[in-house]
Amino acid sequence: MSYMPTSCLVLFFLLFLFHPLPWALSKEDLGWCEALFQCGNNTAGFPFWGGNRAKPCGHPLLELRCLNNITSLNISNHEYNVFHIDQTSNTLRLARTDLLGSFCSAEFNTPTFPREIFKLFPTYKSLTVLYNCDPKLSYRSSYTCPDLGLFSMSQSLDYQNSCQDSFKVNVPTSFVPEEKEMNLTHLESALRKGFEVKLVIDEIPCQECSSSRGICGFNSTTQICCNVTSLSGGVTCVPQHQPSADELRRRCSERFSCGNQRNLYYPFWIPGREYCGHPDFKLDCSGGFAELNIASVNFRILNMSYDSSNKRLARSDYLNDLCPPNPLNDEPLIETVLQFSADTELLTLYYDCQLNSSATSPFPSSYFGELGCDEGRSYYVTRNLSSPLLDRFRGVLNNLREMCKRKVSVPASGPALNTLQTNPNSNNLKMALEHGFELQDNSNCSMCVLSGGSCGYNQNSSLFVCYCKDGPQDNQCDINLDDIIGNRIVAIIIGIFVALCTIGGFIAFLVLLCPCCKVRIFRNRKTSDDRRQEKLKALIPLKHYTYAQVKRMTKSFAEVVGRGGFGIVYRGTLCDGRMVAVKVLKESKGNNSEDFINEVSSMSQTSHVNIVSLLGFCSEGSRRAIIYEFLENGSLDKFISEKTSVILDLTALYGIALGVARGLEYLHYGCKTRIVHFDIKPQNVLLDDNLSPKVSDFGLAKLCEKKESVMSLMDTRGTIGYIAPEMISRVYGSVSHKSDVYSYGMLVFEMIGARKKERFGQNSANGSSMYFPEWIYKDLEKADNGDLEHIEIGISSEEEEIAKKMTLVGLWCIQSSPSDRPPMNKVVEMMEGSLDALEVPPRPVLQQIHVGPLLESSWITEESSSISEIENRNLQVCEKILS
C-alpha cells in the first residue's frame, strides 16, 4: 500500500483552508449585500439579512422579517418587534410581541438570548415574574390574572418556593415594582416601550474587508469577505481574520483629527478606527466641529488636551439657546467611560411650569433661579438634585417636579455655577452652559499608554482592551515597573561595569566582584522601589519632567516665591507660556522621600476648584520637584497679617473659608481614596486672582479608605497652633479625618481675628495654644441664655452675621474630642446655612497640652510667621460679638 507524502498532505490542507470559497449567489445578489435595505420602518445593513437581502449577507440568527411597516426578529422561537436599529452603535430596541398587549394573555416563559450575539444594555435590568403562587400568602407587588391566578414581581427570589413557575422580563433600571399591589398599567406601559440590546459580533473583520473594498458576509457563523473577480466576473469569498495584535497596537496609537480638534484618540473614533474607541464615542466631523451622540443627545468637544486637565465638552443644543425646542433629558452614559471632574455639577432646567408666583418667588436660595423662556414659566437649579445642600428645599423641588412638564439635566462647570449663584442673570447662565464641563482621564487608557500599548475596545466582551505587541490585555501591557523607574540606574551600572572591564589588569578581579556588587545594588534599588511602586502607579497620568527641564522653566531657579519646611518654591514658565509654581524639595535625610511621594500621589488623585492643580513632577536620584499651577495672590497668611496693605472684609474672608471647607470636603468624601491633609494653615491656602482659595502642600497628607474611621500614625505631623489634640495625646481620641476639622476651626478663628485675643492675653512661655478657646466660652457664658448679642459696632448687620456664623462653626470644629466635631460635609452645610440653625456647642473639658521635645521622626513644624497678625478691625468685630 502506498501513502501520500506528509508534505503533500500539508499543502493540500493549506489549499483547502485558504482557497477562495465560491459565492452561492450571482453578482447581482452580491449588490444587495453591499447596500442598506429597508425593512418596515427600519434601515439596516450588515450583519442583518432578510427581504431582498440574501442569507449569506448577514448572520444566520439575524433575519429581519418585514410586514406592513413592522420589523420583527425571531429569537429562540419567540417573536420580537424591532422598534429601532442603530447601525452606528450596533444597538436594537426590542419588545416581545406577546407582551405588547394584555400582560395576562402573554406567554409566561423566558426566551434564551444567545450570548454570542446579544447583550442587554446597562440601562435595563431583568425582573423575575413568579406566577401560580399560593393565594393564601401575601406577596410584594402582586396581581391576580383571571386564568393564571396570582403572580408577583421581584428583583429577588425570596419566596420563589411558594410559586410554581417563573419567567423573566426586561424593563428600564428606573422601573420599580409597587410595594404591595402591582399597578398593571404601569408594568404594561414599561414592557410596550421595549428594551435595548447590543450586538456583540466582532466588527473588526468586516472593517478590514470594507477597507479593501470587499463586501461583508457570513458562511454559517464565520465572517467572510467577498469580491468580484476582475477576470471571470464571478464572486469569490475568503474567511476574514482579525489583524495581528501588533498591527492593532500600531493603528490605534496614531492620533487623528476631527473638525476643529486635533490629536484625538480613545475613547473617540471615526469610521475606520472602530476598534480604537468606545462604541458610544463615534465622532461626527461634518459641521466643522467634533461632535458625538450619546443616548440621542449631541455633545460638542470644546477642548481635548490629553496632556493637561483641560478636557471639556458641552451639550450642542444649549450652546446658543437657553430654551431649545424639545430638549432631551436622556441621561448620557459619558461617566461609564470618562468620569466627570470633581467640580462638575448637574444643572437642572424646568420648562413649561404651571406654578403660582408665590410658590417659587422669591426663591429660598441662590441655588434656584428663573430661566425666562417665552413659552410658560421656566426655572433652573444649580446643584445636583441629590445634593444634601438641597435637603432644606425638598418642598420647592417637589413643586417643580409635579408642576413642570419637562425637566432636563445638563452637566456644567461648578465654578461657572458658583458665579451664577453669586450674580444670577441670563448672561451668566448662558456662559455656564457654553463653558461646558470637564472630564477626567480614562485611567485604564493612561495605564495602557504608559506601558507601551494602545487603547481600544473589545466588541465581543464590551470591555476596554489594551493592544500590546504580544496580544491584547485587559488594562496594560506586561512590563516590569522597576525597569521603567530604574532604567537610568541600570544604564549607569552597566556603563560603570563596561568601563571597569576595559582595565585589563583588573579583569579577573571584576569577574568575581561585579556579580556580587550588581546583586547588592539591584537588591537595594529594588527594595527602595518596591516601597514606592504602589503609590507611583497613581502618577501615571502626570507629566514627568527632567531636572534639566525644571531648571530651564525656572530660569535656573531665579525667582523665589515661597519657602516651606520641606523646600523652596520658585516661579516658572512652561513651554506653552503658562506660569507655574515649582516646589523643589530639600535634599535632606529623614522623611524627604516619603514627603515627595505623599504630596505627588495625593495631589495626582484630585481635581477640584478648591484644590491646587498638580501639573507634573521631577524625580532624578535625590533631586525632586513638584510642578503645580501658579496663583498670583500667593498664600492666605499675607492677607490676614497686620503688615498687609490689602484689607479683606468679612464677606471676602467668609468666601475664602467656605472654599477651604469645600476643598476639605472633597478630600474627605469626593476622592476614590480619602485624603487627610494634616497641615491646614494660612500658608497652605493659596488664592487666585478672584480670591478663590485652593488647598496646597500635601507633604504630610495620608491616604486611607473611606470606611476607615481611625488612622494609625507612628509620628506627629502638623504645625504648632493648628494640630488637633489627639495628634499629641491619644487621651483625646483616635486620629482621623476629624483632625483636619480641628485645624480648619483654628484657621477660621485666625481669619476672623479670634487668635489675636490669645496673642494679647497669653504670656506663658510654654507656647500652648490649648488655652485660647477658654476665653471664648467665658464670654459666651456672659451672654443671656448662651445667645450671641447683636451689637452695633460700626459694621453692617450682614458682616456681623457672617462673623457670628464663622465663630460658631469654628467652636464646633475645635471640640477637644474628635467625635464631637462635625465632619467636613456638615461644616460646609453649616457655613452655607442660616445663622439661626446654629447652636452654641457644649463647652468641652479643655486641658493644657505641654508640647515636649519632639522626636526626630516627628513631622511637626513651628512657623515663625504662622500665627498671623490680623488687622484691628476684625479683632474688634470678634471681641464685640463674643462680649
UniProtKB/Swiss-Prot annotation:
It holds the Pfam family PK_Tyr_Ser-Thr. The modification Phosphotyrosine is found at residue 628. Its main location: membrane. The keyword Metal-binding does not apply. The chain crosses the membrane at residues 492-512. It catalyses: L-seryl-[protein] + ATP = O-phospho-L-seryl-[protein] + ADP + H(+); L-threonyl-[protein] + ATP = O-phospho-L-threonyl-[protein] + ADP + H(+). The modification Phosphothreonine is found at residues 546, 716, 719. Its EC number is 2.7.11.1. Residues 1-26 form the signal peptide. Residues 27-491 are extracellular. Glycans are attached at residues 41, 69, 74, 183, 219, 227, 303, 356, 384, 444, 460. Belongs to the protein kinase superfamily. Ser/Thr protein kinase family. InterPro entries: Kinase-like_dom_sf, Prot_kinase_dom, Protein_kinase_ATP_BS, Ser-Thr/Tyr_kinase_cat_dom, Ser/Thr_kinase_AS, WAK_assoc_C, WAK_GUB. One of its GO terms (cellular component) is membrane. It comes from the Eukaryota. It comes from Arabidopsis thaliana. The active site is at residue 679. The lineage of its organism: Eukaryota, Viridiplantae, Streptophyta, Embryophyta, Tracheophyta. SMART domains: S_TKc. This is LEAF RUST 10 DISEASE-RESISTANCE LOCUS RECEPTOR-LIKE PROTEIN KINASE-like 2.7. GO terms for molecular function: ATP binding; polysaccharide binding; protein serine kinase activity; protein serine/threonine kinase activity. Keywords: ATP-binding, Glycoprotein, Kinase, Membrane, Nucleotide-binding, Phosphoprotein, Receptor, Serine/threonine-protein kinase, Signal, Transferase, Transmembrane, Transmembrane helix. Residues 513-883 are cytoplasmic. It is an enzyme of class 2 (transferase).
